[in-house]
Every structure is written in C-alpha cells, then in structure tokens.
C-alpha cells in the first residue's frame, strides 16, 4: 500500500448525499424535503420566532428509510428544521432564531399542509445517494495535524501536485461524511 493509499484509508468516510429535485414527490411519511416540512405531531404547528412571526420551514429529514444511517441517529425517525426570516449574527441556542425538532419511533406524526407564505424558499424533495468515499477539505477540519503536515511534504516533494487531487470532498446536502462549508 502506498503512502497516499494509507492516508486515504485513514480518513475516508461514507456519507449520504441528498440530491434535490429531479423526480416526482410522493408526499409520504418517509420523504425528505428541503424548503418544506409537512410532518408534525398533532398539536404542533410552524413555530414562531422572537417577533411572533412564523419561521421558515427549511428541512424535513426522514431517517428511517435512508440507505445509510449514522449511529448517532439510529433511534431518530424524523428531523425537522425551521429558521427565522431574520437570521442571527451570532450562534443562538435551539429555539431562539431556529428550531430543530427530533422525532423517534414512538412519536406519532401526521401530515399537515402548513406553509409560511412569506418564505422565499422553493421546496424540493430530496433523493438519497450513497457516497462511498468522502474526505475532509484540507483546511476545514477532519485531518490530524500530522496528516496535514505529511500531505504538505508530499506536495513540496512533487509526489502530488495538490491535496485536491489526493482526497475529494463531496459538496452539497449530505448526512455523515465531512463538512463542506466551514467557517471558523
């Protein structure tokens, strides 16, 4: 095994890419969406932000029918995410400018056709696709310092031209793998 293959073996992760649109939605209890949420508990509605305005339905992620489920979500059935129309400048806790709701198998969910008329998001169903190999972006975390240094040495010695040719990060909506869009 070459040194490059060994580095890849150490950091590779599987992930699930969530591709928006391009197929007919089913509107079922197992369909994930971006820009739409229609699964709620009987007593739930679209949450309100600090100004009393309806939040924007951002994501509905149905876990139980996915072909790859991270261990941390093994007991989760559905996750829904809502955001305020006025996004915060600083990180705020769940429930202030955004709300993440997590449902388990014991939660009874119903389909509700609730919409926020002021949302500018176009809703698309999400189709899961397994990513067999996902790697971290070079300066985005995920690589141990000694691996970063070794990759830089391989670049300087001419063994590789660039980190990007060695390890490829899959960008887009995904579950698992490595983050693609990081800010310090």
Enumerate the predicted regions with their spans.
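Preference for intrinsically disordered or flexible, low-complexity segments
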Residues: 1-184
